[in-house]
Amino acid sequence: MGLSRFHGYSTHTNVPLNQLFFIDEKWLNVAAAIPVNYLTAYFMMVHQAAIREDEWFLIHGIGGGVGIAALQIAQHLGVKIIGTCSGWKHNQIHEMGVEHVIDYRSENFKDRVLEITDGNGADVIIDSLGGKALKDSYGCLAEFGRLISYGFSKAA
């Protein structure tokens, strides 16, 4: 398997040797999907939001594939993390080093984010939920904050 900047939908392409990885044939389908979550998170955070160290970052769906990728990238960048997910995922997310985890089903995440950030709101929010969550995300966005929507699971 290789990584390429272009030709993502091609059946064949040329790739530098240092971007090739041996993958056992029985794992090809799984291996092909691995970069998707991390590249999605990285593109949103670094290229679209230009997230910076010490900014507050709200990750909706922090327990999912893109959410965990965003969490790990944010930790590497020194970003302050707030996440929303189902209550049963809270222990896992806490074990990954996230202090502020909100159960979006039983808590008002907008109020909690404002409380956690001393009323300032999140500097960057990634929202995969859509619907009412998108509206509430705007309500807890810091002045000059950046909100990025992707892969809605509900109609906006």
Predicted regions and their residues:
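Terminal helix/beta-alpha structural elements that buttress the NAD(P)+-binding lobe
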Residues: 1-156
